Swiss-Prot record:
SS bond partners: none
Record family assignment: Belongs to the UPF0145 family.
Protein name, as recorded: UPF0145 protein Tlet_1264
InterPro entries, per database record: UPF0145_dom_sf, UPF0145_YbjQ-like
SUPFAM superfamilies: YbjQ-like
Amino acid sequence: MVLATTEQIAGYEIIETLGIVLGNTVHSKHLGKDIAAAFKTLAGGEIRSYTELLTEARNIAIQRMIAEAEKLGADAIVGIKFGSSSVMQSAAEVLAYGTAVKIKKI
């Protein structure tokens, strides 16, 4: 599966647009890590537990988006975008979406 944030893929022609595909997940951290993160905000710097949380959530969202595209018979997903939002305290949703397409090499 070819993934692109652009609308076109160099060296390929889009021969069919199959539709919008998306993947999302909501993740939360363990209460103990949340308390440790609160203390980290006092000192400043990266809060690694939240960085790991969002990285893991983004990867899951991408895999779910790819699975939707594969069900449609897509070769690629173009125009990929990401969104995130706080669902509740210590829980974040990550959304990945794009357009599933069939492509051929030029």
